Swiss-Prot record:
Keywords annotated in UniProt: Lipoyl, Mitochondrion, Transit peptide
Organism: Pisum sativum (Garden pea)
UniProt cross-references to Pfam families, sorted A to Z: GCV_H
Name by which UniProt lists this protein: Glycine cleavage system H protein, mitochondrial
A GO cellular-component term linked to this record: glycine cleavage complex
Gene of this entry: GDCSH
Length: 165
């Protein structure tokens, strides 16, 4: 009740009315990528991320990608032992909006897959950089990491890509 009275008095003070007949459709552009982009990771223009630690690289799709896909309902992953090639598909993500191939940002051999995604594919939405990782590989060409984007470059890439659409 107190909150309702405060809201009413504030609306009166600001001359706000819920019965306003003026309907405006504001036009504005958002010049900032609102997705999480983490420092310390490398990013591919196809919206996959890589976390390289020692002889292992963990790969998943970015927060930006999962946001555009919507609710993820199914994930297809390769088997351990399979080789992946930079720029080539290694799996797929199916959402309520679309099915998208997932490309490997670097080449290597799959040493582990996130089996938790089988029962909970939504982990890609809720935790794309932690619980929603997809595969771990042993890179065959670690120098391929140098061609990927850092956090600032990826943020700029997303902003430009979103502005173009």
């Amino acid at each position: 009740m107190a909150l309702r009275m405060w809201a009413s008095s504030t609306a009166n003070a600001l001359k706000l009315s819920s019965s306003s007949r003026l309907h405006l459709s504001p036009t504005f552009s958002i010049s900032r990528c609102f997705s999480n982009v983490l420092d310390g990771l490398k990013y591919a223009p196809s919206h996959e991320w890589v976390k390289h630690e020692g002889s292992v690289a963990t790969i998943g799709i970015t927060d930006h990608a999962q946001d555009h896909l919507g609710e993820v309902v199914f994930v297809e992953l390769p088997e351990p032992g399979v080789s992946v090639t930079k720029g080539k598909g290694f799996g797929a993500v199916e959402s309520v909006k679309a099915t998208s191939d997932v490309n490997s940002p670097i080449s290597g051999e799959v040493i582990e897959v996130n089996t938790g995604l089988t029962g909970k594919p939504g982990l890609i939405n809720s935790s794309p950089y932690e619980d929603g990782w997809m595969i771990k590989i042993k890179p065959t060409s670690p120098d391929e990491l140098e061609s990927l984007l850092g956090a600032k470059e990826y943020t700029k890439f997303c902003e430009e890509e979103d502005a173009a659409h």
